[in-house]
Amino acid sequence: MNGVNEIRAAFLDFFRKNGHEIVPSSPLVPRNDPTLMFTNAGMVQFKNLFTGVEKRPYTRASTAQKCVRAGGKHNDLDNVGYTARHHTFFEMLGNFSFGDYFKPLAIELAWKLITEVFDLPKDRLLVTVYHDDDEAYDLWKKIAGFPDSKIIRIATSDNFWAMGDTGPCGPCSEIFYDQGEKLFGGPPGSADEDGDRFLEFWNLVFMQFEQRGPGDRIALPKPSIDTGMGLERIAALLQGVTSNYDIDLMRALILAVAQATGVDPDGPMRASHRVIADHLRASSFLIADGVLPSNEGRGYVLRRIMRRAMRHAQLLGAQEPLLWRLVPALTREMGQAYPELLRAEALIVETLRLEETRFRATLARGLTILEDETRHLSEGGVLSGEVAFKLYDTYGFPLDLTQDALRAKSLGVDMEGFEKAMARQRAEARKAWSGSGEAATDTHWFALREQLGATDFLGYDTEKAEALIQAILQDGKEVLRLEAGQSGAIVLNQTPFYGESGGQVGDTGLIIAPGMRFKVENTHKKLGDLFIHEGIVEEGAVVPGLEVRTLVDHSRRTAVRANHSATHLLHEALRQVLGDHIAQKGSLVAPDRLRFDFSHPKPVTPEEWTQIEDIANSVILENAPVTTKLMSIEDAMGSGARALFGEKYGDEVRVVSMGYDEDKADDSTDGRIAPPFSVELCGGTHVARTGDIGLLTIISESAVAAGVRRIEAKTGSSARHHLNTQASLLHSLAAQLKSPEDEASKRLSALIEERRKLDRELSEARKKLAMGGGSSNGADSPLREIGGIKFFRRAVTGVEMKDLKSLADEAKQTIGSGIVAIVGVGSDNKASVVVGVTDDLIDRFDAVALVRLAAGKLGGKGGGGRKDLAQAGGPDGEAAEAALTAIEESLGSSLPTP
């Protein structure tokens, strides 16, 4: 029992047997926690349990949590590959008590696991405790039988953990393993504690206090336990190796890199193998959890990780994209423990392949600039911060990649200069943004929300309601009155109008009172629950305190509801046809159409398109109920509801289920109720039954970003109108083609192919005509000799530039040695000119110089190309012969007379 998968299973099994709920790893994108970029510890998903905000049906839990540290406070990126234990991705094993057991059992369980299950030798173990934690000190003596020398008191923050400036906190006890005298280092607390000999592998946090402010700390009525053990670290100990990169899992990935590149994994390029193995894990798991490479936020961190790995692939000599070819090795090692890797394998592979293909050009440009800028620097030198910033800002070359490339040359970066350039850019961005009024407006919303409280939303149950005007705004400022003809915004105490959010557009309609009529043109939602009704006063005046009646535009709301429900059906149909890697990346729900962005590495085929439509429409035809339930976020996720990654949800969420009819049983399940077709967390408005959608038809599919596709669709009457238009178009097309409608496509394809064939024949005929014939004698001949050099000149009409080039190439082959000049005149009388020089003459003649002479005669400027072939143009086609004569005269003056 010392393989990584066996160790993970043994840890969880031990705590299962000791009454702990085994909770699956949460995603790397923290749910409902905007303070974190990535999940970086096992306790992240339990934060609300520790603070008492949330309750769950268990008080003991254990997890194997996937973690990423590559951004913000916890950033290990720069060290990865160069040390024995730094990673961007790692697994943290942990056990947790939420007001259940405390120090005695926590220490007892830890000791039993490491000495009885993991069978670590007791004489190699030692622990630290916080300097005044006498209870933990005494418990270690009692349970483990440690002498005083093996229990080290530490007074620093290393042994005291806090969630923040306020909140739960408490002392820690860290467990260390002595790896022996072969490694340098001293015990914790000593001058040499940073060495590798004494390895900390498990941290027990005793949450027994609440920090209420500076110097204000009280005891918690129900203390808790939070522990974290690095899986890679304990695996290294159990496998008898001193580096995490030598454990079985990492070694398998490193050997896959070596096999793909043919480079010794234990030679001078060892660090590059390690970087790729680590970054492959981080990149793949992030993509599987819905993160895609981009230029901001989490996507940018992912891009940095991927590009650093790609840089090291280039150092290993990889001539083609490498990372995507390593994904099968990763899924073999970790797919069983984390099935999301298997579900998203196609997306991971394609995302890595596309990103690396794009980055190769960026990498080449960046490395060329680096080479030029560092050529004059000696060992220990520093690259200008301005240059490093230019690489980052202009060429998309992350700073850590620049630092990594310079590390091999023993060079550094002027970080102060880089930060100054970055600060200057931010200041310019702020300056460009200032004056928009957005910052002041946002501040105003906070003040207004605090003054008025939340707007009570009634729109799930009604489209009409009585309300009271609480505030009026115009140009972002609060006013006391709006007259007829004036535009502004109204805040009500309650409203049936849906505020734009979650991709769904805001409602429109009317707000009326005796003698007053306000047309609502849009509804926004600020700060989550403050509804702003924008529009224009059509009659009377609007004043605060006025009692009004609200009327949502029913037909528009009905169309929006249908489109929103259709996006849910479309989402699930996409997953069923394309795979479980499908994740929503954005949406628009409008009355006339819907738009759905989703993660997928390649275009949807026509066959898949049809399947997706058929599946969604089959659920619509069932006319099954659409049900909505309010439940806790935990219960919702436990029920299988899908949530958007990175979306912030409250303690209570709306769960929308479709394709579930409690009055019908599924014959295939022996009378049991069939599961819902779609279950999602959603705050939007929906139809009562799927049949209310009427019909769904996809009208387009396209790419919007790397690894992100977009489908646009219509429902109901809009869909019928679209299909009727398409049918009319097909009928008209078939009539013009004189073919049955079901054969129109085949007939059109045949005509297109026939047209292409005629175009090719016409092009060949024009080229033959342009080449002409005859000998080198006579003034009208296209071929003449000047000073012993053959010169072919020709002015033609109706020949495109691409054909001019092929004409020039053909003429060069025909004459064998010489110079070719051809001018083509279009129907608009504009001219194009091509000059070609055979290879044996390019040391004497330059096609670019000659073509520029012709361009001048044609009224053009410049010209470009190579010494053997160049092109130019001009507006004066009448001067075609003059342009050719200019080239001929230039040749005549530069060549000796025979």
Swiss-Prot record:
Cofactor(s) this protein cannot do without: Zn(2+)
GO molecular function: alanine-tRNA ligase activity; aminoacyl-tRNA deacylase activity; ATP binding; tRNA binding; zinc ion binding
Residues at which Zn(2+) binds: H564, H568, C682, H686
Domain of life: Bacteria
SMART domains xref list: tRNA_SAD
Keyword terms: Aminoacyl-tRNA synthetase, ATP-binding, Cytoplasm, Ligase, Metal-binding, Nucleotide-binding, Protein biosynthesis, RNA-binding, tRNA-binding, Zinc
Catalytically driven reaction(s): tRNA(Ala) + L-alanine + ATP = L-alanyl-tRNA(Ala) + AMP + diphosphate
Gene Ontology CC annotation, any one: cytosol
PROSITE patterns: AA_TRNA_LIGASE_II_ALA (PS50860)
Co-factor binding comment: Binds 1 zinc ion per subunit.
Single GO BP term: alanyl-tRNA aminoacylation
Entry annotated with the keyword Nucleotide-binding: yes
Pfam families in UniProt: DHHA1, tRNA-synt_2c, tRNA_SAD
Enzyme class per UniProt: ligase
UniProt-listed Enzyme Commission number(s): 6.1.1.7
Cross-referenced InterPro entries: aa-tRNA-synth_II/BPL/LPL (IPR045864), Ala-tRNA-lgiase_IIc (IPR002318), Ala-tRNA-ligase_IIc_anticod-bd (IPR018162), Ala-tRNA-synth_IIc_core (IPR018165), Ala-tRNA-synth_IIc_N (IPR018164), Ala-tRNA_ligase (IPR050058), Ala_tRNA_ligase_euk/bac (IPR023033), DHHA1_dom (IPR003156)
Main location: cytoplasm
Subcellular location per the Swiss-Prot or TrEMBL entry: Cytoplasm
Family, per entry: Belongs to the class-II aminoacyl-tRNA synthetase family.
Function according to Swiss-Prot or TrEMBL: Catalyzes the attachment of alanine to tRNA(Ala) in a two-step reaction: alanine is first activated by ATP to form Ala-AMP and then transferred to the acceptor end of tRNA(Ala). Also edits incorrectly charged Ser-tRNA(Ala) and Gly-tRNA(Ala) via its editing domain.
Comment block on domains: Consists of three domains; the N-terminal catalytic domain, the editing domain and the C-terminal C-Ala domain. The editing domain removes incorrectly charged amino acids, while the C-Ala domain, along with tRNA(Ala), serves as a bridge to cooperatively bring together the editing and aminoacylation centers thus stimulating deacylation of misacylated tRNAs.
Protein name: Alanine--tRNA ligase
Species, as recorded: Beijerinckia indica subsp. indica (strain ATCC 9039 / DSM 1715 / NCIMB 8712)
